[in-house]
Design a protein with these regions (language model features):
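N-terminal positioning helix adjacent to the helix-turn-helix/winged-helix DNA-binding module
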Residues: 2, 6, 17, 33-34, ...
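N-terminal helix-turn-helix DNA-binding core of bacterial DNA-binding proteins
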Residues: 15, 19-61, 141-144, 150
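Short, locally clustered residues in the helix-turn-helix/winged-helix DNA-binding domain
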Residues: 11-14, 39-43, 103, 130
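Charged, amphipathic alpha-helical coiled-coil/dimerization segments
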Residues: 18, 67-130, 134
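C-terminal regulatory/oligomerization modules of transcriptional regulators
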Residues: 1, 120-150
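A conserved beta-turn-beta hairpin within the catalytic core of GNAT-like acetyltransferases
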Residues: 12, 47, 83-85
């Protein structure tokens, strides 16, 4: 039985959408990662670790992204109001304005990407994609990595 390569289709669509989004966000001097971090930090007080988990970013990428946001004056690392040991990512006023403009761009790019779908089909697609993302978030058993022979 021949079926569509779901992994390939998702990868191609994701890659194309990410490229479109990156190009569009250049207009406000943001990357998709920066936009994602700013939006999650604006939602509520969150630590760098919490935001990294929400954004599916590894530790090194998260640190680098927050460093960039700090250099641009868009966010700051601050002590948490609820846990003195933790540092939160606080968005500056400049960062809030950039994130709002960035979100308008994100919404426009998403609308353009899904524009060929009817409203009910679009809603069903986004719902199904969200469910799929939740299902595959836990990758399950990982392949065994064998040591290379020398």
């Amino acid at each position: 039985m021949t079926s569509r390569d779901v992994t390939g289709l998702l990868n191609m669509a994701g890659h194309a959408l990410t490229n479109r989004l990156a190009a569009a966000l250049e207009d406000v001097d943001l990357t998709p990662r920066m936009q994602c971090v700013l939006i999650h930090a604006l939602e509520e007080e969150r630590t760098q670790i919490q935001i990294a988990a929400l954004a599916d970013l590894d530790k090194t990428t998260m640190v680098s992204t927050v460093d960039d946001l700090e250099r641009r004056g868009l966010a700051e690392r601050r002590p948490s109001a609820t846990d003195r040991r933790a540092r939160i990512i606080a968005v500056t006023e400049k960062g809030r304005l950039a994130a709002e403009e960035g979100q308008r761009i994100v919404d426009r790019v998403h609308a353009e990407a899904l524009g060929d779908l009817s409203s009910p089909t679009r809603a069903a697609f986004v719902e199904a994609l969200g469910r799929l993302a939740g299902t595959v978030k836990d990758p399950g058993p990982q392949p065994v990595r064998r040591a290379r022979g020398r």
